[in-house]
Amino acid sequence: MAKKSVIARNEKRKRLVEQYAAKREELLKAGDYEALRKLPRDSSATRVRNRCVLTGRGRGVYEKFGLCRHMFRKLALEGKIPGVKKASW
């Protein structure tokens, strides 16, 4: 499980991206890079990390499900993810 502070930091970044999205778009279209540079760094979408919603793990996350590979496998084998079953051919 990831540290709670790391998860909280990522959530803060998500909020900032949402808050400044319109302003960033407007400044990019205008080409005003000086004003864009003065915005908070964490308001850039590239600083947000996809994390597992259950464990907070930052690597091996399936974006479609929002789960890391470990939790995805565990829940899929338990039959808790609808429409997902183990491959067999």
Curated annotation (Swiss-Prot):
Alphabetically ordered keywords of this record: Ribonucleoprotein, Ribosomal protein, RNA-binding, rRNA-binding
Domain of life: Bacteria
InterPro entries: Ribosomal_uS14, Ribosomal_uS14_bac/plastid, Ribosomal_uS14_CS, Ribosomal_uS14_sf
Biological process terms in GO annotation: translation
Gene3D superfamilies in the record: 30s Ribosomal Protein S14, Chain N
Pfam families: Ribosomal_S14
NCBIfam families cross-referenced by the UniProt entry: PRK08881.1 (NF006477)
PANTHER family: 30S RIBOSOMAL PROTEIN S14 (PTHR19836), SMALL RIBOSOMAL SUBUNIT PROTEIN US14M (PTHR19836:SF19)
Subunit structure and binding partners: Part of the 30S ribosomal subunit. Contacts proteins S3 and S10.
Known role: Binds 16S rRNA, required for the assembly of 30S particles and may also be responsible for determining the conformation of the 16S rRNA at the A site.
The name this protein goes by in its record: Small ribosomal subunit protein uS14
